[in-house]
């Protein structure tokens, strides 16, 4: 972290890494563990409906390689298509993780696009917040929707950059920038990152962090890609803090003409 920077704070807890990672799509638990270590991430998200964190005693337990003592676990509601399913999944996560209250809410609209269903997302967020969950919420890149979720009490808003798993990168940087500039909670790009340059762009826009899974797990060398993403997030953040030069239509000479010898 740059000496010019301040740590990321989510739900009152401080983090030095602004890269958050998922646990799906890896070949095995060993690769999962090694990639997460290479990423330097401190927040690791887990799909409760697809991962074993103790509910299936006879199967490999993800918590054997991702200890709650080393990482902040972020249970998510991936695979939920209505508010009722999402709320039930968060309650299960709280039970399995001994009262853990930080969750990532995502309520999907359909299986083709995996875009969020905002009506169901609002309903689920309202219930979860009333039940004292700390909700980090997946949403689209609509600035109005993002602000509404913030005002409801979500502790972080996570707009998509592009469809989940698409690797298309930041499709609408202007909307992401608008969300960032109007927010008072952390804005974390979630979904659509494909390579290191995408992560850097998200950070250069002023996002507080980036969450990704497929971009690392689906790479030909996940461990190396995890390391690349770590560096990209750090470089993008430093570039944002440094302040880029303005874009110009015409050239601007690097060396002044005044004081030349001939």
Swiss-Prot record:
Q: Where does 1-deoxy-D-xylulose 5-phosphate bind?
A: 165, 191-192, 213-214
Please name the GO terms that the record assigns under molecular function: thiazole synthase activity
An example GO BP is: thiamine diphosphate biosynthetic process
Q: Does Metal-binding appear among the keywords?
A: no
Q: Does the keyword Cytoplasm apply?
A: yes
Keyword annotations for this protein, in alphabetical order, are: Cytoplasm, Schiff base, Thiamine biosynthesis, Transferase
Pfam families for the chain: ThiG
Q: What is its EC number?
A: 2.8.1.10
According to its UniProt record, which reaction does this protein catalyse? [ThiS sulfur-carrier protein]-C-terminal-Gly-aminoethanethioate + 2-iminoacetate + 1-deoxy-D-xylulose 5-phosphate = [ThiS sulfur-carrier protein]-C-terminal Gly-Gly + 2-[(2R,5Z)-2-carboxy-4-methylthiazol-5(2H)-ylidene]ethyl phosphate + 2 H2O + H(+)
Broad class of where this protein is predominantly found:
cytoplasm
Report which superkingdom the organism of origin falls in.
Bacteria
Subcellular location per UniProt equals: Cytoplasm
Pathway connected to this protein: Cofactor biosynthesis; thiamine diphosphate biosynthesis
Q: Which InterPro entries match?
A: Aldolase_TIM, Thiazole_synthase_ThiG, ThiG
PANTHER family annotated for this entry? THIAZOLE SYNTHASE
Role: Catalyzes the rearrangement of 1-deoxy-D-xylulose 5-phosphate (DXP) to produce the thiazole phosphate moiety of thiamine. Sulfur is provided by the thiocarboxylate moiety of the carrier protein ThiS. In vitro, sulfur can be provided by H(2)S.
Q: What is this protein called?
A: Thiazole synthase
What organism is listed for this UniProt entry? Nitrosococcus oceani (strain ATCC 19707 / BCRC 17464 / JCM 30415 / NCIMB 11848 / C-107)
Q: Which gene encodes it?
A: thiG
């Amino acid at each position: 972290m740059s000496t010019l920077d301040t740590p990321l704070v989510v739900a009152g807890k401080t983090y030095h890494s602004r890269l958050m990672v998922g646990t799906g799509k890896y070949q095995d638990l060993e690769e999962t563990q090694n990639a997460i270590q290479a990423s330097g991430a401190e927040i690791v998200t887990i799909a409760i409906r697809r991962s074993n964190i103790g509910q299936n005693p006879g199967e490999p337990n993800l918590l054997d390689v991702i200890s709650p003592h080393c990482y902040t676990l972020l249970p998510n509601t991936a695979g939920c298509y209505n508010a009722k399913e999402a709320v039930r999944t968060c309650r299960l996560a709280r039970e399995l993780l001994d009262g853990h209250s930080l969750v990532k809410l995502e309520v999907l609209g359909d299986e083709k696009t995996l875009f969020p269903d905002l009506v169901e997302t609002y309903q689920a967020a309202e219930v979860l917040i009333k039940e004292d969950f700390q909700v980090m919420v997946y949403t689209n890149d609509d600035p109005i929707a993002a602000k509404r979720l913030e005002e409801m009490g979500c502790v972080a808003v996570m707009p998509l950059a592009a469809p989940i798993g698409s690797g298309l990168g930041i499709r609408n940087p202007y909307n992401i920038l608008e969300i960032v500039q109007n927010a008072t909670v952390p804005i974390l790009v979630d979904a659509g990152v494909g390579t290191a340059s995408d992560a850097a762009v998200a950070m250069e826009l002023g996002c507080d962090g980036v969450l990704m899974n497929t971009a690392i797990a689906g790479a030909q060398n996940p461990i190396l890609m995890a390391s690349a993403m770590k560096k990209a997030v750090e470089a993008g953040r430093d570039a944002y803090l440094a302040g880029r030069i303005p874009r110009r239509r015409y050239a601007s000479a690097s060396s002044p003409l005044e004081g030349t010898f001939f």
